[in-house]
Structure formats: structure tokens, C-alpha cells
């Protein structure tokens, strides 16, 4: 057998007695695959034994103390040479140990140290069953790729403030215990620089050389797993909580207080549609905590202390904060709703803030940089951290809370073991000092999910339906993802609940009393259920269809060539906003006489864009509001539009919104300036906005220089002549007959003495509807139109 496959045997003093030995008794086949030169141990395959001489000890064995401290430090079970000749034994078919035969040791006994007895839950004089163990056999232990151990001083009365070199400790540990078997949870005491160090195996990762090469080893804390320590095993030490032991900052090994949970996987987070946001948060806030402290010290940087998550309601801000707490190997996060901080007693609100940081301060004083991470999560942060000086009242409680939070996060006594996560829907209300680097420096907008994100969310929320066979095959998740534009994650969850309610309702007997039908096993959620749910659940940041459709009740009548040209020009602006790389904002003014159809045309262009966000701003929605409330309302609509990738805002009758009247004249300059600013304000990167505004007072807007705020202007004229009037009244039932229309138009021309009309289309349609109620429709229509046509 090639001697390179022999592993060192432990001497009585716990050191290699000879460089190589046969791993098992018996003979080996000369045809077995052996190692080749220039191959690492993990690339080689050991030769396989042809037969094994395994002796089964008879009768139970009794647990006794190890013979000496030196023997206890070998991590071996002391046995009699008359009982065992093998190096490994398995006790009660669960714990594997290396053995050390000691002449004169009583037969039928196992000498176990205190760590052995603690790990195996043994009592002195306890009877156990023992068998030989073959780590190289088909059911043996694989080789350890890596192992993490938690260390502390065994004797709390004999410690030192001198930091230990973790790499030096790992080399000594590897050489002292090479070829021994280790499992998660196993306890061991070893000597390092004359100090007894107590270690507990936390996780291991194994590589089985017999079945594959270069396999990706995964860390596991499963106590049933075990592996064989080799000279190539990577060993990492982490100090125990509240331990006085100190480890030097390493340039190659991670921090001693690991930031991530063992075995953490990103795919287990269960966050749909937020992959890029979560990756950015991890890169900015946690990546530096994974690197060795020595490397971080060399860079001279501090870890990120605060993250601000902002965005519309229901988009997953709280979910990300909750999942971050699960991901990190830290204490249970302190979750605080903003208003809970406030208290009616003087000074108590500030005291509540100090209490949140008390544990972190205490541990940082005791352990310094070795302190564990403390996470504090503030929900509805804008409730307690408004801009200082903006709150009403003379108590100043809000300002004092902000001051206290600023001091705790980045004051004179800085803490480097905290992570504050704030969540809000109103980032604009947060005090600027809290948003600077050193405090809540990572600002992450959790916006509405795109189509790919919505598909992920739909799959997550319907996974249980699909796995249980309740989801019909006709449900296409990709179709639903395309139909749920601007739906937040919470609204998608509501959509699925609504679809389920339709499925439930099909199995309810409606009579004198509601009862469930017997065929419950046939409950299925199908495509029609989701389509019905889409008519019930509307996104908060979606299309104001009812408002806009009410402006185009009868549709658009192409009574003249200019109407088609206006629609075509409007479509060009829509395509410009959607596709142009240079213009993310386009504002268009539709001007014309009263009742000329400006609002209907603007609404038609907006609805035809099929943008996910379409809103109407009109004076109707602001009735009863004072000036400040109107400004806030208009600003809120524009802020909401910035949350959608593609948006259209229809601003109807600007002169009514700004309270303009010709007598005086009078108007609200605050509203005027607000609109002029918002019409020119560029949306954030990745967001596009089309503004369609209407006015019947273009001359007034020109005098106010407001027309300069628009990129383009479209004139919407009145109905000019009887030819255009004929095309309009064709759509009215009472004038469907061509002879009736010809008679009507001739009588109108005779009445007015001209073929000119110059009346708005909306006014004409209103006159026609009124005339339909009269017995003599034609006469009523002609008389009303004659009064409406302006006389020259």
C-alpha cells in the first residue's frame, strides 16, 4: 500500500507517534486506486480494503474518569489493550471516539473525560454498549472539509487579556487531533499556550472522496453527521457569548462573531419580486461584516449602522426587515412601532429610545468589536422622526426624540454593534440629519414589483394551492402577472383571496340557511375566478378608470379631420414617453373653448396609453379643501406617479384648480407655482411621466407664463360648420335618418342665415339629448342650436 495514504496515529501524549500508519487492519488489493503525484488530498481516492478483521467486544462497558489530565487532552477514550486493538469505537451506536490503550487500565471500562461525558450525557459508572468503528468502510465517516468551533476558557478564573491567533490555534488543533472523528455538538478541551481551551463543534462540512471530486460541501449542524479530521481541513474558531477569550483580527478568516446563520441560503428567504433590492441591501449593509476583521481594519471603514426602507404600502418593507432578522446570526430584533415611543410624561419618550440601545451599549462596553449584532426595527418611522421644527405645539417632544435617536446612532460614544432599520411611506417627512451617512445611510426604495416580480409573488402565494391540486390547469401565472400592473405584493395576496372566495361560493348552498355542499374535494380555483377577482381588487396606484370613462361616456366622434389628428398626435407623445431615451417627462396642454371636448380627448389618450398608472386631477376632487390641502393633494398624485414605471396624469381645467376668476382678477399663486414646478419636475430614474392638461383660458395662462411649462400644445376647436354638425348628430337615434338630418340642418341654416356653427361638441350633444325629450325633436333642436350659435 502506498504510504501516503496512512494517517498519523496519536501517541499517549496526544502527538503523532509516527508520520504514517495503516488506517485499518487487514490486507488491501494491489489493484485499488491509489493517489498520484501533485494531487491534493481532496482530489485523491484512498485504496479500498479487501477484507476487515473486526472484533466485536462482548458485554457492556462501564464509564469511569480518564486516568490523567494529559490523557483527557488527547480527546481519546482510555481503554485496556486487552479490550480494543482498533483506533475507533462507536458507543451506543451514536457517538464515535478515538481510543488510547493504556497498559494496566481495567478491562470492561471506558475512561472518559468531562467533555466526553457532557457531550454523550453519561454518568460515572453508567453501562454502555461499544462496537468497533471503521471510518474507512462503506458506512464510515467522510473527510472533513471544514469545521467551526466555539471556544472559551475552561477555567473562568484563569484567563488572559492577550488575544490569541486563530490561525496558529487552528494549526495546533489540526496537528494534535488529525485523523480523529468529529460531530456537531461534540465538546473537547485542548491546551493552547498553557491555557485549557474548551471548544464545542458547531458546524461541519464533509467531502466523501469515494463518490466524487471537488463537491460543494455544505455546512451542517446535524449532530448525526460526522467526519474525519485531516491536515487539509479548514478550521474556524468563534468565541463563545460572554467569553473573556479574545481572538486576533484575521486577514484570512471571518469575524469570530459570524454575522450569518449557519447554513443560510438566499433562496430560502421567500421574498418575491425584491431580488435586486435585497441584493443591494446585503451588499451595502452586510458584505463588510463577512470579511475578516483585519481586512476591514486595513480599509479603515466602519460598518453600516442604519437602513431606511421606503415605498408605497404593501410592497414588502416589513417582510424584508423580518427576513433580515432571520438571516442574521444576531439577537432577536427589537421591533418598535413609531407611535409606541411617544409618552405623555416629560422625558419618558427619550427614555424609551435610550432603553432600545441599552443592551447594545452594555455589551459593547464589555466586549468591544467582538460584540454581537443588535438589530432595532422602527415601523412607521415618520411618526417620531419628522423634520425638527415642523411639528405643531410647544412641547417639542418630537424634536427631542429625533435628537436622542441621532445621538445614540452616531453621537460621541459611537456603537459599532447596532443595525437600525427604519420603514416609512413618507421619506420626505424624515429629518435630514437622520438620513446622512453614519445613521440611516442606506436608502432603499421598495417600489411596486415589475412583471417578473409579480410572477414570483403569484407563485409564492399559490404554491400551496398548486401542490395540493386545487389550482386548475387553465390558470396561467404569466397572464395574471401581465394583468396585475401596479399591484403591490399585498394587493396580489388580496387578489388570490378574492379568487378563492369565488371558488368557495360555488360550493355553498344558498337557501334559508347557508351550508357547505358535500363535494368539497372538488373545490378548484380556475382562471375565471382570477378574472372576476381582477374586477374587484384594484391597485391603489392603478388606473382611475371610472373617473376617466365618465369623461368619455359616448366615446369620441370623429366629426372632423382635426379630431383624428389630435388623437394621432397624442399617441405620438405616448410613444415618446414610453420609448425615448432622452425624454422621461412630456407635458402637453390641450386648449380650446368650453365644451369643445378637451377633457374627453385627454382621457381617451390617457386610457389608450395602457400605462399602469393613470390619474385625474380636477377641481371636483378638491371641493372643500383649503389652499394647503389642495397643494398637498396635487403633490401626492405626482409623488404616487413616480412610484410607477409608466404614468399619465390628466390635469383638467387648470383655471378651476388655481381658483382663477376674471373679476379682480383673482387666483391662488401657491397652487399656480406648485403646478408649474411639478409640470417641469423630472421623474426619478427608471420612471416616465406624461402630463395632459386642459384649459379654456389659454390667454390667462399665457399672461401668467404658465404655457412655457408645457413641451407641446394642441388646439381643440369647436364644431365649425353644418357639415361637421351632420357627422355628430348621425350618432343620435332621433337623427339616424338622413332625410331627417337634411331637414334639420336646412331649417337651422334658414333660421341663422349661415352655415357656421362654432359650438362645442359637448354642448351640441347636450342639446340633442334635451331635444329627444320633446314631441317635436327637430324643432326643439333647431331652436336650441340657434340660441347657442354666437351671432356675429
UniProtKB/Swiss-Prot annotation:
Residues 26-41 have a biased composition (Polar residues). Residues 1-46 are annotated as: Disordered. InterPro entries: AAA+_ATPase, AAA_lid_3, Asp_de-COase-like_dom_sf, ATPase_AAA_core, ATPase_AAA_CS, Cdc48_dom2, CDC48_domain_2-like_sf, CDC4_N-term_subdom. It is found in: Cytoplasm. GO terms for cellular component: cytoplasm; Golgi stack. The modification Phosphoserine is found at residue 58. Keywords: ATP-binding, Cytoplasm, ER-Golgi transport, Nucleotide-binding, Phosphoprotein, Protein transport, Repeat, Transport. Pfam families: AAA, AAA_lid_3, CDC48_2. The modification Phosphothreonine is found at residue 252. GO terms for molecular function: ATP binding; ATP hydrolysis activity. It comes from the Eukaryota. Required for vesicle-mediated transport. Catalyzes the fusion of transport vesicles within the Golgi cisternae. Is also required for transport from the endoplasmic reticulum to the Golgi stack. Seems to function as a fusion protein required for the delivery of cargo proteins to all compartments of the Golgi stack independent of vesicle origin. Belongs to the AAA ATPase family. This is Vesicular-fusion protein sec18. It comes from Schizosaccharomyces pombe (strain 972 / ATCC 24843) (Fission yeast). The gene is sec18.
